[in-house]
């Protein structure tokens, strides 16, 4: 039976970057990991309406740097930067070191898999027909410039007695091509009939010309001998006399 690998996990170090960049001793590793989870849960709960996609955490010596990718930066920053200053103080308490918060604006929310999945989940919770929510999300993403998109819903769709899985795809979604820039996310929608799982894959184009260009290798010199031209077969006179 075939199994599917995580589309982002298999591309880490190739065309994708880790959401947490830090080094720790074996004794500190679990402490840092739990602390990262606490920070992410706190930010997603506090900034629920800010349309947050990713939270990147870096830990330079004696400090912490948190980058929040959001489609609504104004909600995070607040009036005259008051909200972001308050946020930095709270994160400093949680992490135990001075925390710096940076905001990264998402200019195309329809090309971000997490925001698309959250949008579908919120529509399902408002009792919008699941097929309409799927097709609307697919059309908006393709209109925004996506090369391909796939949406999959699992659960008691439409309040059915038996749970099932339905999916809708448009364009190309090459999961086996490592140079393909594929964004993926899974979100849960809590409906009156139970939990519905929402998965979204978005293909945004290829990043690299070839796999070797990731490591910037030295180009191999041409070792083949140059081709020899013939002895002017094309310049021979036509001596046939008819």
Curated annotation (Swiss-Prot):
Entry GO terms, CC: cytosolic small ribosomal subunit
Assigned keywords, A-Z: Ribonucleoprotein, Ribosomal protein, RNA-binding, rRNA-binding
Organism domain of life: Bacteria
GO biological process terms, semicolon-separated: translation
CDD domains according to UniProt: KH-II_30S_S3
Signal peptide bounds: none
Alphabetical list of SMART domains matching this protein: KH
Alphabetical list of InterPro entries matching this protein: KH_dom, KH_dom-like_a/b, KH_dom_type_2, KH_sf_prok-type, Ribosomal_S3_C_sf, Ribosomal_uS3_bac-typ, Ribosomal_uS3_C, Ribosomal_uS3_CS
Disordered as annotated region, ranges: 218-242
GO molecular function ontology, one term from the record: mRNA binding
Coiled-coil region(s): none
Residue ranges of every copy of the KH type-2 domain listed in the record: 39-107
Similarity comment: Belongs to the universal ribosomal protein uS3 family.
Function: Binds the lower part of the 30S subunit head. Binds mRNA in the 70S ribosome, positioning it for translation.
Subunit structure: Part of the 30S ribosomal subunit. Forms a tight complex with proteins S10 and S14.
UniProt protein name: Small ribosomal subunit protein uS3
Organism: Psychrobacter cryohalolentis (strain ATCC BAA-1226 / DSM 17306 / VKM B-2378 / K5)
